[in-house]
Regions:
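N-terminal secretory signal peptides that target proteins for export/translocation
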Residues: 1-9
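Bacterial N-terminal signal peptides
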Residues: 15-25
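Glycan-association/targeting regions that enable binding to alpha-glucans and other polysaccharides
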Residues: 22, 30-134, 431
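Soluble, non-membrane globular domain cores that form compact, hydrophobic packing
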Residues: 28-30, 106, 383-390, 417
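Juxtacatalytic substrate-recognition/specificity segment
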Residues: 134-252, 269, 294, 298, ...
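Acidic/His/Gly-enriched intrinsically disordered linker/tail segments
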Residues: 202-214, 219, 225-230, 242-395
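Juxtamembrane/start-of-transmembrane alpha-helix segments at the extracytoplasmic/lumenal side
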Residues: 392-410
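C-terminal membrane-anchoring or membrane-association module
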Residues: 405-433
Length: 433
C-alpha cells in the first residue's frame, strides 16, 4: 500500500488559501517596532498533538500566528493564536490521525503589529514520533530499522531484507538510491493500525509513505516468512516513487502495485489462480479500472493485486525487463500514461490492456457503466416523420410549427443583440488620435 505525494497534495490543496496568506506574510515589510523571541520548544505526544511554545517580549503587537509546514504541502498554513500574550502557545492536534509517525514538522511563531507588518521568530523543527514504545534501531546502507519486540537477530534479518529489496528494485527500475529510508516494525495489529491512521483498510499489512520516506510493517518476530514478502514489496514503492515522481502525473496504481508484487514474490500460483478463475467467469477488471484505489471488498481487492502482477508479468514476457527503465524515466518527465507506455513499449495503454486480456483468453468484453438511453414513446399528436397521425395531425403539426417559429424568432433577437454589442465594443475600441 502506498501513501503518495499525490495523496498528500490533496491535503495541501485544502490549506492553499491559508498557505498563500502565510507566504504573503513572509514577504511583508518589517515594522520599525520589534519584539524579542525566546527559545522555542516543541513537545510531541503520539495520538494527542505537538505543543509549540515560545516567550516574546518588547514592543506591543496586535495578534500572533503559528506558521506550519508539513512534508508534501504546497506551502505553509497559518493559524491565528487565541489570546496571545508574553508566552505564545499552539497545539497541533494529531488525535484524528491526520499525520503518521516520523513526520517532520517545521513551525515558527510570527507577530503582527498594528500597522499590519510582521516579525517572525526562529524556526523550530520536530519529528512526530510514536512514543508508545521503546524503539531500538539498526542502521544499514539505505534502511534504518526501528523495532520494539524481538531480538537483535530478528532485527538484522528484517534489515537485510530491506537492504536487498532496495537494491533489487533499484537495479530493475534503473533508479539510483541515495536518501535514507526509515523502516518501523510493529508487532501487533492494533498498534500498527493506530500508527497508520483511521483510513487504513483492514487487509493492509504494510504501507510505504513515500513523502516521509517511511515504511510501516506488521511483522511478528515469529513470522519472518511474511516479512520476506512485505518488506521488499513496500520498499519497491519507495524506489518506484523516487524514479517516477513529478509535479504533473502519477503512474497507474496497477503498475505500481504490480511491480511491487512481481519484485517481492513474482507472479505466484495463488495470483495465477485468481486471474484464471476471473477470466473463465468473465469477471476480470480491465486495467483502466485499476488506475486509482483498488476495490474495498476482499475478493476484488485481492483480484486487483493479482491482475496487476499478471499485467506486469505479461509485459516482461513479451518485451523483456529493459523497457521498464525507459518507462520509469519517461514518467519522471510528467508524461501521460499513453506517452510513457508508447515511449517504453511502443504501444499505448489501451493496447496494453487489449494484449493482456488476450493473453488471458479474452478477446471481447462487456462494457458496464452509462449506456445510451433508448428512444422514448412519441407524444400523442406528434409524428416521427412529419406526416399525419390520425385526426390530430393538423393540431400536432401546427403546434410543432409554432414552437419552431418561436425558437427561430428568439434566436434572431439574440443574434441581433450580440451584433449590436459587438459593434459597440468595436467602436469603443478604436484608438484615440
Amino acid at each position: 500500500m502506498i501513501t503518495s505525494r499525490r495523496a498528500v497534495a490533496r491535503r495541501g490543496c485544502a490549506v492553499f488559501v491559508s498557505g498563500l496568506l502565510g507566504l504573503l506574510a513572509l514577504a511583508g515589510p518589517v515594522s520599525a517596532d520589534s519584539v524579542s523571541f525566546g527559545t522555542p520548544t516543541a513537545t510531541s505526544t503520539f495520538g494527542k498533538g505537538i505543543v509549540f511554545s515560545q516567550s516574546v517580549s518588547g514592543a506591543s503587537f496586535k495578534e500572533a500566528d503559528m506558521v506550519l509546514t508539513l512534508p508534501g504541502d504546497i506551502g505553509p498554513s497559518v493559524v491565528k493564536i487565541k489570546n496571545p500574550g508574553s508566552s505564545l502557545t499552539y497545539t497541533f492536534d494529531t488525535s484524528t490521525g491526520q499525520i503518521q509517525p516520523n513526520t517532520k514538522v517545521s513551525a515558527r511563531f510570527q507577530v503582527v503589529f498594528a500597522d499590519g507588518t510582521t516579525q517572525q521568530g526562529p524556526e523550530t523543527k520536530v519529528t512526530y514520533v510514536d512514543d508508545r514504545f521503546h524503539w531500538q534501531t539498526k542502521i544499514g546502507t539505505f534502511v534504518t530499522l526501528h523495532w520494539y519486540e524481538g531480538d537483535a537477530a530478528f532485527a538484522q534479518q528484517a534489515l537485510t531484507m530491506g537492504e536487498n529489496g532496495i537494491s533489487k528494485s533499484a537495479r530493475f527500475l534503473g533508479v539510483t538510491e541515495t536518501a535514507p529510508i526509515d523502516f518501523f516494525v510493529y508487532a501487533d495489529q492494533q498498534s500498527f493500525y493506530d500508527a497508520l491512521g483511521p483510513g487504513t483498510r483492514e487487509n493492509v499489512g504494510g504501507e510505504a509513505n513515500t513523502v516521509t520516506r517511511t515504511l510501516f510493517a506488521l511483522i511478528s518476530p515469529t513470522d519472518l516468512g511474511y516479512a520476506r514478502t512485505v518488506v521488499p514489496h513496500e520498499l519497491t514503492h519507495v524506489v518506484f516513487d523516487d524514479g517516477t515522481t513529478n509535479p504533473y502525473h502519477s503512474p497507474p496504481r496497477w503498475l505500481n502495485e504490480g511491480l511491487a508484487v512481481y519484485l517481492s514474490e513474482g507472479f505466484g500460483s495463488s495470483d495465477k489462480s485468481l486471474v484464471s478463475q476471473a477470466a473463465k467467469s468473465k469477471t476480470l477488471m480491465p486495467l483502466q479500472a485499476l488506475t486509482g484505489q483498488f476495490p474495498t471488498t476482499a475478493d476484488r481487492f485481492y483480484l486487483a493485486y493479482a491482475e496487476s502482477v499478471s499485467a506486469v508479468d505479461y509485459l516482461i514476457r513479451k518485451y523483456g525487463q529493459a523497457p521498464f527503465q525507459k518507462l520509469v524515466k519517461t514518467y519522471s518527465t510528467g508524461a501521460s500514461d499513453d506517452e510513457a507506455f508508447t515511449a517504453a513499449f511502443g504501444i499505448d495503454t489501451a493496447a496494453v490492456n487489449k494484449g493482456w486480456l488476450a493473453d488471458n483468453g479474452i478477446t471481447s468484453s462487456q462494457t458496464f457503466g452509462p449506456q445510451t438511453a433508448p428512444a422514448g414513446p412519441v407524444p400523442p399528436g406528434w409524428t416521427t416523420s412529419g406526416g399525419s397521425q390520425g385526426g390530430q395531425s393538423g393540431q400536432g403539426s401546427s403546434g410543432a410549427g409554432l414552437l419552431i417559429a418561436a425558437v427561430l424568432a428568439l434566436g434572431g433577437v439574440v443574434l441581433l443583440g450580440v451584433a449590436a454589442v459587438t459593434h459597440t465594443r468595436d467602436r469603443d475600441a478604436q484608438p484615440r488620435l
